[in-house]
């Protein structure tokens, strides 16, 4: 994979997808914890935001969700939360932002990105949430 990361198009696609998956997982997991903490079922949450219960079940499933920002904002609001953006820490900016903007990384950085990606993917699988 480190060799593939030398290709600017692959690098941008890989980093973009990695950040997308990690961010969605983080947001969805936080919303699911808030839902559980509030004692809400998925069906009750769906009623609160006037959507089909399948929308909420899909959001909290272990499959690779791709929710809209609107859905995430509505779910967050129903749980007394809001979505916010925060700057990346310096080490993540170096590993993600700079390569995205430049379209290139050094061989050492490519190896490190590949190593971190493998480690994150092993540990970031969301467990299926009971219905």
Regions found by a protein language model. Name each.
Residues 50-66:
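Recognition helix of helix-turn-helix/homeodomain-like DNA-binding domains
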Residues 1-29, 94-131:
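N-terminal flexible/basic segments that precede or flank functional cores
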Residues 29-46:
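Short basic helix-loop element that most often maps to the first helix and adjoining turn
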Residues 86-96:
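Short amphipathic recognition helices of helix-turn-helix/homeodomain-type DNA-binding modules
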Residues 70-85:
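DNA major-groove recognition helix of helix-turn-helix/homeodomain DNA-binding modules
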